[in-house]
């Protein structure tokens, strides 16, 4: 009796075309993947630099496992801390040009832990309406008052600050640097200016910018020359860096505070030796091989040019989204593309307000693969 509501809820999800299920990939990650014995060109991956299947990352992960075992065996404050963790945190801080960094077991946990640690019931959070789920849920869990401002609209944010800021002890402005389901960038410089004017903290999630944007690949903060500004950077090791885990980068005082107050860091097992070592190797490769990032952007610009007549969203990243009128049409197009050997996800409500096909471009895509996508889209649309 107590669980019968689940059947009705699932039926509603099916009727709305919101039902989701997993697809098993049976090959190494890369620009091509295998599913059910068939090969597909992969436009569904966040592996922007093509490092997740790189032999050097695999070697680093295997060697770390052989030396330190498969798990960290405890929280970082008890038995779970390894020198590898410190090496990775030092590398991240160096990349981000911050005093220190702290590694979490995922980017989601990094956001939840940081937000809930630095604000509470007497505080205000102002977040972009299109922020990632981890930022939104972290905001809810913090017990702070949460208001959303219109997407990338600094004028709306300013109005809300003028109206509400004075009522609260602390205020935290939260934004993605690159928005994962649209591909566009936040107005970072305007946000920094407003944070200074209204005595606010600013948290920027660089998940889809790290390794991709900026002169050294450090992210959007580097791109705008704001690395020396007082802000909090979070991100993931699971996208361009091809591993797993998340991080927070900022002042020494902030990181010291989080070690003592971030629940998702204190009360969970440390990142595995394999993931830690692979991420560390990825940062080295990213810094030593800038041609990977150049090839990625060559591919992005090629695809943008070829798809200029399509209904593409404005994008500042390797995430290119094609707006589709209905959920049903988005699902049909994704299925038709798959029949043609191209794996592209249909993104639909409630994840996003409107349906779309989301193409993730990789440095390892060949021009022939990009052209095959263009040709197929021209045939189908």
Swiss-Prot record:
By its UniProt entry, which PROSITE patterns does this protein fall under?
A: AA_TRANSFER_CLASS_2
Q: What is its EC number?
A: 2.3.1.47
Sites binding pyridoxal 5'-phosphate sit at: 107-108, 180, 205-208, 236-239
Q: Which cofactor does it need?
A: pyridoxal 5'-phosphate
Per UniProt, the keywords (alphabetical) are: Biotin biosynthesis, Pyridoxal phosphate, Transferase
Give the Gene Ontology MF terms in alphabetical order. Answer: 8-amino-7-oxononanoate synthase activity; pyridoxal phosphate binding
Residues at which substrate binds: 20, 132, 351
Record keyword Transferase present: yes
Q: What reaction is this protein's catalytic activity?
A: 6-carboxyhexanoyl-[ACP] + L-alanine + H(+) = (8S)-8-amino-7-oxononanoate + holo-[ACP] + CO2
According to its UniProt entry, the protein's GO biological process terms are: biotin biosynthetic process
Task: Give the matching SUPFAM superfamilies.
Answer: PLP-dependent transferases
Q: Which residues are annotated with the PTM N6-(pyridoxal phosphate)lysine?
A: 239
Source superkingdom: Bacteria
Q: In which pathway does it act?
A: Cofactor biosynthesis; biotin biosynthesis
Q: Does the keyword Transferase apply?
A: yes
UniProt cross-references to InterPro entries, sorted A to Z: Aminotrans_II_pyridoxalP_BS, Aminotransferase_I/II_large, AON_synthase_class-II, AONS_Archaea/Proteobacteria, PyrdxlP-dep_Trfase, PyrdxlP-dep_Trfase_major, PyrdxlP-dep_Trfase_small
Q: Which PANTHER family match?
A: 8-AMINO-7-OXONONANOATE SYNTHASE (PTHR13693:SF100), CLASS II AMINOTRANSFERASE/8-AMINO-7-OXONONANOATE SYNTHASE (PTHR13693)
Q: Kindly state the subunit structure of this protein.
A: Homodimer.
Which protein family is named in the record?
Answer: Belongs to the class-II pyridoxal-phosphate-dependent aminotransferase family. BioF subfamily.
What does the record give as the function of this protein? Catalyzes the decarboxylative condensation of pimeloyl-[acyl-carrier protein] and L-alanine to produce 8-amino-7-oxononanoate (AON), [acyl-carrier protein], and carbon dioxide.
* Record protein name field: Putative 8-amino-7-oxononanoate synthase
Question: What species does this protein belong to?
Answer: Rippkaea orientalis (strain PCC 8801 / RF-1)
Tell me the organism's taxonomic lineage: Bacteria, Bacillati, Cyanobacteriota, Cyanophyceae, Oscillatoriophycideae
Q: What is the primary gene name for this protein? A: bioF
